[in-house]
């Protein structure tokens, strides 16, 4: 992990091939569908029904009433004053805030005083940061330390950066800190004990796996693999004992405590062993990795807004991609939404070719001249046209077929005054577009929630966030007095404060006081709301995550804040973004080691993925041959399906592929939910000694006949000559599972061949139809939909276990409950459907 392979990575930002736009994938394809954009323009032009200030042109006009003169003596040329149209209701009425006389009197004086104090604090904060900067460069960075630091900053690749970082750590004496396990920001004793126990249990489990174990297993005692599983379930949790505390990575330029690193590597080895071990069945592995995934959580990459500052995100994403730790969950806001859309609509190999300076040829949103956008801004209140931006954005989102990503990108970038609120679009079944959420219009999300950590945790179980923060108005306030991940405090070899204690204390006080007075403005509602927006949120929301990356901008970025980048400027921004992400990669890689194994286990052992193993049971040629043999047989020939080979059936009027057979009293199918065939237990003594008895359906039918006389029918054996062919309604098997029934079931056919049949009542048929487990199939009738699970097929689960290793439950059903449903007194036990 994070070992750079030169042959697989994309070109460097300053290489000649990185400026060749012809090497970009799909460079000449705009992915523009004119019909889609016509629907988008139509939705934008529609009146907003939710806004009382917008006239609805589609509503029926009120009838004009008749008028008459008051009298005949008034002058006919008298001027009549027109009634003034009522103004739009205020955005915040008096009854909304319960404004009184004192509020109106003191609002503006208080606002002036608070804004003046905020201005003073801001100036003081700038001078404090300037003092800290001069202190570090004049006191801290001198001699060999400054030379090694300059080499670290000029590293062109991550491999080169690691070498420079290790040299700087050795010079600063950080190697001794790594060897000492004690640290107040994590539980070192528990981590050490868990690591030792993991090593012992994994070695014992590996010996049991290979058969080289000298210990004898005693019945009733748990095996080593079970103890290892229980220990991993207890310790593989988000920030277990503080092993994911960012402070553990803030004392060195590269790496962390040796005890923490050893624990992570051993946890990775133990997870890999359980993933491939044969001592645990598929059901136990599925439950294990689902439990670990819920406790450990997911990692998300969050890209902030910031207009053209967002192009620094390309470098951050490139560093994560080249290191192999780019998360699967990516979110972006405003300008970051455009970068997130590009990352999520392309493969890793395509991204390595796209994240290059030549991409600037595809970023043309600000191509219009000054006179054009000024006229538009005066007429519409927005600098840019929404439909034009949608067409420019189509290539970045690659014309996604299932959802309209470009409309979401525009909605996230709709800053008041820059882009008017837009309508989200959704794709219908026929491929056309229509407005989403009743045509409601959306605007820039960064004004309220730049980093949606709560929503990510709620919907995707995100517990670890990587934030790339480039907002220019907030970057200056990112300051870690005791160092950050991969950027330790070098003053007094890491035991001091940045800029000394006085400098750090002053910085903290000013920043907290600024935040306090901004909250006063918001809670007292002193700040005006231009364009109907509460602008205090752009300062008071959370802008950081577990790891926060803030690329260093330069003053010229403010001048080009609303212009398209040139290839040269984009190359610099990609390079700076990469450099800013290098110090964080080790921390991210340690997290990704465990998360990738957990997600691999979840994908491999979820029920949907098991269907891929059918090729190991029957090949495509085998299936085709069996289907041909099925169609070539005449109705009089014997059925090739063992389950329906008998002409008698206790639960149906005719035999069919996959029909259940009547089981003798005493034969049990006691199975836990989703267990394999190894769990099937038969009692040979019961099979030989127990006399034959009526089937379950026959008993229920007889009982129902006593309750419902009009539906009562005598239970008489069915004439074999009148038995329908198993292929009357099916010319092929209902599913592939019917081709290989369990061996235990095939052995029982001789015992059930001559059993009497009984006609079922309509009521029982309705019960079975409603309680049958439906599987995917072709055809619209009940036989095709229910397949072999109709009419109480208790052998279906066992048949699945023979083919797949667990019952075939299609879809991502990850319920962990274990059910055992028994038919007491009827001689049958089976899985409740």
From Swiss-Prot:
Protein topology in the membrane:
Single-pass membrane protein
Question: Which residues are responsible for catalysis?
Answer: 334, 444
> What are the start and end residues of every segment in region (Disordered)?
1-20, 49-71, 630-657, 680-833
| GO BP field | cellular detoxification; lipid catabolic process; triglyceride mobilization
Question: Keyword set for this entry?
Answer: Hydrolase, Lipid degradation, Lipid metabolism, Membrane, Transmembrane, Transmembrane helix
Compositionally biased intervals (Basic and acidic residues): 740-750, 759-769, 782-794
Renumbered to this chain, the Polar residues biased-composition regions fall at 689-707
Transmembrane stretches in the record are: 108-128
Q: Where is this motif: GXSXG?
A: 332-336
Low complexity: bias regions: 644-655
By sequence similarity, the record places it as follows: Belongs to the PLPL family.
Q: What is this protein called?
A: Patatin-like phospholipase domain-containing protein SNOG_00918
